[in-house]
């Protein structure tokens, strides 16, 4: 048993490990978010001062991004589905795949350690100096967080190399790149983004580490450094990172929508590929829209404003192609279809607030208010998470060979839908009214919307626990699937359910008609 899981070189077993790790980390991250909302449910302090509050906020962000969304989307779905969809026997480097996973538990341990030693890293996930320098954060907390990020980064880079190699080298003989499934494309582009952006983050946090411990002054004006340099380096990673979090979701939603619509491929398949490539490319040239308030030139701000708005074009292509895929079908409101429809609608709402924030003049006012929080939680908490949930209920029969209870799944979907919207929609109003981020207390005038927001988070918690209960119910009742009802253009369903330890004993042949 230990050998099977500790030394595994099988992409399915490693994918399952990623799922279990991601679900566990997701529960930790959810607990932290509940602490935040409990603190903000009423004016006045509940947990303590702003230091402990910001430590919770920082840990919540890091855990949700690096230990929940990325392991589940790229590690879980990516490992499980990419080889199956390509007809490959496994990933290109199976042992490196195992190492990618086993770097994550030590990494999350370092992160949790960082928040329980000294005063914790109360810097926000951006870790800006001088707040993160040894003047403001004297203990070892920030150093531990930096090491944690290094490990998570190494894990992601190795995984990215693995996926890129697999996708380039392990396709069937006649399969051209434009014939690859959209999910494989999305993971490939995501891997490329990881490979190009993470080394920049590694450089930035290494310089921060030496600033803190070796008396260098990369980010210290007293020695000729500049904290703005850190911001540029961080956001050059940080902006592609948010596209890394959503792109695999795009791929999953494309598959779910085309399959649930009974269509053999998504509308505008090639356009979808080019749209994802455009999003990936543009994601690298818009980073300074996170820094409109640091005093850049007017022409610089004009460029970053317009470049950011251009990203709305390929994103719109994807939204309308999904709607066109749905067009003309009798929509069957299955659980995975509900998640996909919720994704398309709420991701669009999140994208619209993003276009508003792209205006540098408006952003000067809205920067660091709850409007920004509402924006990125709409695209993450209702984009990435809805895609994860939709993908999970869609491919769960493939992964386990069992069925989930569809009636309970629908109840769970609507509970979660109400919960997340009730949590994050009022935050737009709070932001427009000027409530700043990263504070544990607020003036009484913001009380009512905060109470509603906190209420929504409690509903989301109930929905999350209901989901765990549904999975548990499925695992103990073992309703085994006899045969899949899937279309023949989705080759991952050609397997036994669940697939054999080695899925392809001979290479598939692609026939062109």
Swiss-Prot record:
InterPro entries: Cyt_c_oxase-like_su1_dom (IPR023616), Cyt_c_oxase-like_su1_sf (IPR036927), Cyt_C_Oxase_1 (IPR000883), Cyt_c_Oxase_su1_BS (IPR023615), Cyt_c_oxase_su1_dom (IPR033944). GO terms for biological process: electron transport coupled proton transport; mitochondrial electron transport, cytochrome c to oxygen. The chain crosses the membrane at residues 16-36, 62-82, 101-121, 144-164, 182-202, 233-253, 267-287, 304-324, 337-357, 379-399, 413-433, 451-471. Its cofactor is heme; Cu cation. There is a cross-link at residues 239-243 (1'-histidyl-3'-tyrosine (His-Tyr)). Keywords: Calcium, Copper, Electron transport, Heme, Iron, Magnesium, Membrane, Metal-binding, Mitochondrion, Mitochondrion inner membrane, Respiratory chain, Translocase, Transmembrane, Transmembrane helix, Transport. Mg(2+) binds at residues 367-368. It is an enzyme of class 7 (translocase). It comes from the Eukaryota. Heme a3 binds at residue 375. It is a multi-pass membrane protein. Pathway: Energy metabolism; oxidative phosphorylation. Ca(2+) binds at residues 39, 44. One of its GO terms (cellular component) is respiratory chain complex IV. One of its GO terms (molecular function) is cytochrome-c oxidase activity. It catalyses: 4 Fe(II)-[cytochrome c] + O2 + 8 H(+)(in) = 4 Fe(III)-[cytochrome c] + 2 H2O + 4 H(+)(out). Component of the cytochrome c oxidase, the last enzyme in the mitochondrial electron transport chain which drives oxidative phosphorylation. The respiratory chain contains 3 multisubunit complexes succinate dehydrogenase (complex II, CII), ubiquinol-cytochrome c oxidoreductase (cytochrome b-c1 complex, complex III, CIII) and cytochrome c oxidase (complex IV, CIV), that cooperate to transfer electrons derived from NADH and succinate to molecular oxygen, creating an electrochemical gradient over the inner membrane that drives transmembrane transport and the ATP synthase. Component of the cytochrome c oxidase (complex IV, CIV), a multisubunit enzyme composed of a catalytic core of 3 subunits and several supernumerary subunits. The complex exists as a monomer or a dimer and forms supercomplexes (SCs) in the inner mitochondrial membrane with ubiquinol-cytochrome c oxidoreductase (cytochrome b-c1 complex, complex III, CIII). This is Cytochrome c oxidase subunit 1. The gene is COI.
């Amino acid at each position: 048993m230990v050998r099977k899981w500790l030394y595994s070189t099988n992409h399915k077993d490693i994918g399952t490990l990623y799922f279990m790790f991601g679900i566990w980390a997701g529960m930790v991250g959810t607990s932290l978010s509940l602490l935040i909302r409990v603190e903000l449910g009423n004016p006045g302090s509940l947990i303590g001062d702003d230091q402990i509050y910001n430590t919770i906020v920082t840990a919540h962000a890091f855990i949700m991004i690096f230990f929940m969304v990325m392991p589940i989307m790229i590690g879980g779905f990516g490992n499980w589905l990419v080889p199956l969809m390509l007809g490959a026997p496994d990933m290109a480097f199976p042992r490196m795949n195992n190492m990618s996973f086993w770097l994550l538990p030590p990494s999350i341990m370092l992160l949790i350690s960082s928040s329980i030693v000294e005063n914790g890293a109360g810097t926000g996930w951006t870790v800006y100096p001088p707040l993160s320098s040894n003047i403001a954060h004297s203990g070892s907390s920030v150093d531990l967080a930096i090491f944690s990020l290094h490990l998570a980064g190494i894990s992601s880079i190795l995984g990215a190399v693995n996926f890129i190699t697999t996708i380039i080298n392990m396709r069937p003989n006649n399969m051209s790149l434009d014939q690859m499934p959209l999910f494989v494309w999305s993971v490939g582009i995501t891997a490329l983004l990881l490979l190009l952006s993470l080394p920049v983050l590694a450089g930035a946090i290494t310089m921060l580490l030496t600033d803190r411990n070796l008396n260098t002054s990369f980010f210290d004006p007293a020695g000729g450094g500049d904290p703005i340099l850190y911001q540029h380096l961080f956001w050059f990673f940080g902006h592609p990172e948010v596209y890394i979090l959503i792109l695999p979701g795009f791929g999953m939603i494309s598959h779910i929508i085309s399959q649930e619509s009974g269509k053999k491929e998504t509308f505008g398949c090639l356009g979808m590929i080019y749209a994802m490539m455009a999003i990936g490319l543009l994601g690298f040239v818009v980073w300074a829209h996170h820094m409109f308030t640091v005093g850049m030139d007017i022409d610089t701000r004009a460029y970053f404003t317009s470049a950011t708005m251009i990203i709305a074009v390929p994103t719109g292509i994807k939204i309308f192609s999904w709607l066109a895929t749905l067009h003309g079908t009798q929509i069957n409101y299955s659980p995975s279809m509900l998640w996909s429809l919720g994704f398309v609608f709420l991701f669009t709402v999140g994208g619209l607030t993003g276009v508003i924030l792209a205006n540098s003049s408006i952003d000067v006012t809205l920067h660091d208010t709850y409007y920004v929080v509402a924006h990125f939680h709409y695209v993450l908490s209702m984009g990435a998470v809805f895609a994860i949930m939709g993908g999970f209920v869609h491919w769960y029969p493939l992964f386990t060979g069992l069925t989930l209870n569809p009636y309970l799944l629908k109840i769970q979907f609507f509970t979660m839908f109400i919960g997340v919207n009730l949590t994050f929609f009022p935050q737009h109003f709070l932001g427009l009214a000027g409530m700043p981020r990263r504070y544990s207390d607020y003036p009484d005038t913001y009380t009512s919307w905060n109470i509603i927001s906190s209420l929504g988070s409690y509903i989301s918690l109930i929905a999350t626990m209901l989901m765990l209960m549904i999975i548990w119910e499925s695992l103990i009742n073992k309703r085994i699937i006899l045969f899949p009802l899937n279309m023949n253009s989705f080759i991952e369903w050609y397997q036994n359910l669940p697939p054999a330890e080695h899925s392809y004993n001979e290479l598939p042949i692609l026939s062109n008609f």
